[in-house]
């Protein structure tokens, strides 16, 4: 017990030191209002208002293709999807209680971007065969995650393999030149377990009786999750997901045809073909220690990056480009004193960066937002529908 506390304090002071180092380096820091963060990896409020869960058994029997198919069928969820699955501008927006501000957590790590449509995670890139559970918390239940989860929380847990090896392959074809191949491989041997998936999707021109719309999409995404277990009490997990897409589509912009800068602009709509690309990668390393059935500690580091661009543009000197990166660290400790009383504490630090941004009107680079949290949360379940939270 003493060793555990010393380890927790050491990590705590290490993070505080790193905060001072970042400030000394001259990076722009934004201190937000105090926020409440929960360390509960699995919520015990199943069946209560504002909480919906699809477990592994339901996922296997539901004939789902991806995580988007699962989420859009949950009660109380309004979903607005834009673009083809995995497309250049594809995203899936969740509305809970009328708010579009939500947080996506995959295997304990926040996975959507802060700001713009990049905050709207594309769930269609996660194959259903990789999912162990999908949970949705409405705004009331998700408020413990802070202002970023005003609309709610979507919490996804991916599979850890059981004993043996299992491989599945799925091939699909359809209209508009659509082809899709999926492979999923799960295995466990002794203290090691792994899960691997890969998907490739191709789609061609859209056409109807009236017109044909030139377009092309070639998307590949894959992921691996490798876990080393130490008995029944601890495990170390490395997760890596990668996405790559190439696109051709018809888009438009507005060009100013007024040569005199002192006069109001005369905007003319231009429609043209463009090539586009998008790449993403997510890397996470987590260590989880279970001291007892009611006490656990999770420490992790993560990094996400995304690069999207139009390769061909009317203005070659200023193509549209967006390059983002997030790096973070968290340490969460939770102790359940009895079924209706849980104490949680920890630290979290993450840095969002705009490495490069360009469009026809502006150019921007090296923008950084640093978020830090040191929290202690005391939760009392007073009744089935009444919860008291102190922080």
Where are these regions (language model features)?
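Structural signature of outer-membrane beta-barrel domains
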Residues: 42, 111, 174-176, 201-205, ...
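Face-selective signature of the C-terminal outer-membrane beta-barrel domain
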Residues: 229-244, 272-391
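N-terminal periplasmic "start-of-domain" segments of outer-membrane beta-barrel proteins
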Residues: 32-65, 93
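A beta-strand signature from Gram-negative outer-membrane beta-barrel systems
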Residues: 125-168
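Short acidic/polar hinge/loop motifs at secondary-structure boundaries
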Residues: 93, 110-138
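Extracytoplasmic beta-strand/coil segments of soluble accessory domains associated
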Residues: 68, 72-110
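Periplasmic-side early beta-strands and strand-to-turn transitions of outer-membrane beta-barrels
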Residues: 155, 163-164, 184-276
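Short strand-turn segments of transmembrane beta-barrel domains in outer membranes
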Residues: 158-187
